[in-house]
């Protein structure tokens, strides 16, 4: 499930069901599916300042991870977000934004401390979480936001 490579428009993700490497677009409608077995893929992508606005355009819950490679707590959060992207592959899109390479997105969200996770739905910021959180806390937040989205529908 670990992204294998990325560019400005897509990331390569291994299918959790069959292991096939699939290119996952940063911005696409619908769900990313495995080209081989057609299982839902975790939607975990790297976005840039240029692709960010398209990346958050989805009806799914979006979890934006503002991070940097030198940040220890960011490295601790990364596997948790990967796991959540697998566990909620049909309802959650995780977007990773490297703050060192994408200053505009960082400024737009006033990211002064990282890791910083931003929950977004339909373009609206629902919650901002600053600092590394344990998996149970992040899972609760995802479930709370998904429940609120379901109740609003």
Model-predicted segments: where are they?
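Residues immediately within or flanking Cys/His clusters that coordinate Zn2+
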Residues: 10-13, 31, 68
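Short cysteine-rich clusters marking metal-coordination/redox-active sites
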Residues: 15-18, 34-37
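Cys/His-rich microdomains that often coordinate metals
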Residues: 22, 40-41, 78
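Short linker/helix segments within small regulatory modules
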Residues: 24-32
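A short beta-strand-turn-helix
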Residues: 45-62
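Thiol-based oxidoreductase modules, predominantly thioredoxin-like and allied folds used
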Residues: 47, 66, 77-104, 111
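Short pre-active-site segment immediately N-terminal to redox-active cysteine/selenocysteine motifs
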Residues: 60, 67-70, 113
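Non-catalytic, surface beta->alpha helical segment in thiol-disulfide oxidoreductase systems
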Residues: 113-152
């Amino acid at each position: 499930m670990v992204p294998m490579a990325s560019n400005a428009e897509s990331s390569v993700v291994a299918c959790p069901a069959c292991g096939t490497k699939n290119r996952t677009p940063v911005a696409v409608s619908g769900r990313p599916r495995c080209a081989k077995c057609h299982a839902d893929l975790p939607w975990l992508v790297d976005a840039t300042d240029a692709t960010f606005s398209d990346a958050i355009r989805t009806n799914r819950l979006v979890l934006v991870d503002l991070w940097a490679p030198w940040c220890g707590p960011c490295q601790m959060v990364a596997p948790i977000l990967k796991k959540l992207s697998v566990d909620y592959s049909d309802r959650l899109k995780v977007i990773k934004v490297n703050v060192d390479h994408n200053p505009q997105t960082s400024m737009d969200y006033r990211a002064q401390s990282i890791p910083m996770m931003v929950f977004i739905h339909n373009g609206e910021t629902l919650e901002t979480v600053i600092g590394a959180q344990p998996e149970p806390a992040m899972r609760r937040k995802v479930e709370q936001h998904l429940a609120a989205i379901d109740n609003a529908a």
